[in-house]
Amino acid sequence: MNITGIIAEYNPMHNGHIHHLEKTKEICKSDVILCVMSGDFVQRGEPAIIDKWSRAYAALSSGVDLVIELPCVYSLSSAEFFAYGAVSLLNSLGSVSNICFGSEEGEMHDIYLISKILVDEPYEYKSILKDYLNQGFSFPKSRMHALEMYLNSSLSKVDHGLNHDILSSSNNILGVEYCKSLIKLKSNIKPYTIKREGNNYNDLELKTISSASAIRNALKSKKEISTLRYQVPKKTFDLISDNINSLCYKDYIFDYIKYKALTSKESLNKLPDVSEGIDNKIYNSLLKCSNMDSLMTLTKNKRYTYSRISRILTQYFIGFDCYNTESLRNSPCPYARILGFNEKGKYALKEFKKTSSIPLITKVNNYNFDALSLDINATKAYSLINKSVNPLDDYYRKIIIV
């Protein structure tokens, strides 16, 4: 059985995702498509616009055969930990043959070579990286500049025809991180990539293949929902229509964050991504702000990107400060939490029961993992801003079978 893994958020699922699924099946000759999907909070550091169960159903209705939840300790982390959590999960299942991801690059050669450099970390590259970090640049910017300088230097033995701009594009960065994780884990899973079609990741203009950002922006701007009819699969359109009064946005968590900070300021510095006094800057900014946008504007600087600050705030909302999340996200994913499957997915699960080195979780009350406890708390937190979600849904909701 040729099982292909994909890693996605489907926030929400759109035509570009359908293109990815179709091309993946064609390129990988897949018998089964397994999706590791972020839960109720996504890598941008925001609540998902629609809950994880509904998004899993849309995925299973649109070409995915099995959906497994990526624990939020990974989904609410940098690209490196996000990728490591998802790839380690796929690797531990024991029967996944390949993964396929979308990228702006569209070819594996350069992505894989750059991944190898970043895993090996040659001395010359590390020295340049340190210089940029010392100048106050964010890690992503420092790494991009350091890699470009390293590739241009006579010290580099790699192909000088490499695309040096790979690390300037969001999906390329994730692709590099997926490959880095495969290399570190000494995995036998083979990576494939397809060229991303349509809007760039952060583009806000609606097109035939629109980015998830553009779709969310249109919904938040209260545009007529009919404008999305041809931007998303029918199941997603129906899902959005049915949930139009319970869609979630990052602004909704602001008051909860502000109250928590005002009553327990010291807990901010217990978050895994907090350093260099950013917790004090966040606290002082909160005193002056009345919404998330103004808070982000006041807090962002050269070292701390918008996404990193957004993740810190959402981690705080969920309660990352109560767990040793730094240790959790540096460890391979310890379990596979099943959200839903179809007939093909059912056969894949039978295969995983023979080969997996981690438990396949269908009932959360049977297991005691810190990462799982954090996910249960994430659902409780999400229920505060999405009234269609019960805080105990992780215990009561049945696995989706289509």
Curated annotation (Swiss-Prot):
Chaperone listed as a keyword: no
UniProt superkingdom: Bacteria
An annotated GO BP: tRNA modification
Compartments reported by the entry: Cytoplasm
EC number, as in UniProt: 6.3.4.-
Main localization category: cytoplasm
Gene3D superfamilies: HUPs
Protein name: tRNA(Met) cytidine acetate ligase
Cellular component GO terms, alphabetical: cytoplasm
List of residues binding ATP: 7-20, 102, 171, 196
Annotated InterPro entries: Rossmann-like_a/b/a_fold (IPR014729), tRNA(Met)_cyd_acetate_ligase (IPR008513)
Function: Catalyzes the formation of N(4)-acetylcytidine (ac(4)C) at the wobble position of elongator tRNA(Met), using acetate and ATP as substrates. First activates an acetate ion to form acetyladenylate (Ac-AMP) and then transfers the acetyl group to tRNA to form ac(4)C34.
Protein family: Belongs to the TmcAL family.
The species this protein was found in: Clostridium acetobutylicum (strain ATCC 824 / DSM 792 / JCM 1419 / IAM 19013 / LMG 5710 / NBRC 13948 / NRRL B-527 / VKM B-1787 / 2291 / W)
Reactions performed catalytically: cytidine(34) in elongator tRNA(Met) + acetate + ATP = N(4)-acetylcytidine(34) in elongator tRNA(Met) + AMP + diphosphate
Gene Ontology molecular-function annotations: ATP binding; ligase activity, forming carbon-nitrogen bonds; tRNA binding
Keyword terms, alphabetized: ATP-binding, Cytoplasm, Ligase, Nucleotide-binding, RNA-binding, tRNA processing, tRNA-binding
